[in-house]
Amino acid sequence: MQEEWLFINTHKNNPYYNMAMDEALLNLVSQGALPPVIRFYGWAPKTLSIGYFQKLEKEIDLDKVNAGGYGLVRRATGGRGVLHDKELTYSVIVPESHPMMPESVTAAYKVISTGLLEGFKNLGFQAEFSVPRTKEDRERLKDPRSSVCFDASSWYELVVEGKKIAGSAQTRQKGVILQHGSILQSIDVDELFDLFIFSSERLKERMKRSFYSKAVSIADLTDEEITIAMMEEAFYEGFEKGLDIKLKPFEVTAEIEQEVSVLIEKYRSEEWLKRR
């Protein structure tokens, strides 16, 4: 009999709510109050999220972010900057002790990302796992030249035709794995790169050309319109098949929303945003 996990779709929300909900669910799974959870969500306004270890004022053009009315939030996970707009965002929250979850981060990535792989298959795309093949590729992951996510594929992220199509980040806290990531419906590369600081315009253009060669969205792969609703259905079924689980739709309770409202203040605070 398949194990039952909870499924939550919170749709579009502000960036502080999105990050607070991930943390609240992590806490509840850690306490044993909830079984493993898969959540889908979106962003309003469109938002630049930065990794836990990124240096805000060194890497991000805050004037452009503010002038454009973008949301801005620091994630609890590592990785690089992501502009969240036309995408389906997912999070998987599961105990480290779960029999399905390997101890190593990269191996756990592969298990969780199997759900993404099956989701892309449901949409008709032959995605595959990226594996950095050379020592140079592996070293580059440790010391990335770019602040922009999707500029390179990490271990077991998803690529189509050699280009990264889903970017994910993972953290482990309180005995729980939280992996969340972006599945790109479409992307505006010029808009994305305008939000980051580069030492010269020449470097910016070079990095942008490199990005075009390494990243792709669903809209780049097909003339058919793939809606967010179609993506939700494809990846819902993909996670069920890839992880061999049964998803049970779950409505967020008032108690969970109360914890989220407290955590929102953390993610909204200058202290959290400017911690590095």
From Swiss-Prot:
Family annotation (Pfam families): LplA-B_cat
Keywords attached to this entry: Acyltransferase, Transferase
BPL/LPL catalytic domain residues: 32-247
Parts forming coiled coils: none
One of the record's GO molecular function terms: lipoyl(octanoyl) transferase activity
GO biological process, one term: lipoate biosynthetic process
Keyword Kinase belongs to the record: no
Pathway entry: Protein modification; protein lipoylation via endogenous pathway; protein N(6)-(lipoyl)lysine from octanoyl-[acyl-carrier-protein]
Enzyme Commission no: 2.3.1.181
InterPro entries: aa-tRNA-synth_II/BPL/LPL, BPL_LPL_catalytic, LipM, Octanoyltrans_LipM/LipL
Catalytic activity, as annotated: octanoyl-[ACP] + L-lysyl-[protein] = N(6)-octanoyl-L-lysyl-[protein] + holo-[ACP] + H(+)
Top EC group: transferase
Keyword Acyltransferase: yes
Residues at the catalytic site: C149 (acyl-thioester intermediate)
Site (Lowers pKa of active site Cys): K164
Function: Catalyzes the transfer of endogenously produced octanoic acid from octanoyl-acyl-carrier-protein onto the lipoyl domain of GcvH, an intermediate carrier during protein lipoylation.
Any further remark recorded for this protein: In the reaction, the free carboxyl group of octanoic acid is attached via an amide linkage to the epsilon-amino group of a specific lysine residue of lipoyl domains of lipoate-dependent enzymes. The reaction proceeds via an octanoyl-thioester enzyme intermediate.
HAMAP family found in the cross-reference section: LipM
Subunit: Monomer.
Family statement drawn from the similarity comment of this UniProt entry: Belongs to the octanoyltransferase LipM family.
Protein name, per record: Octanoyltransferase LipM
Organism of this sequence: Macrococcus caseolyticus (strain JCSC5402) (Macrococcoides caseolyticum)
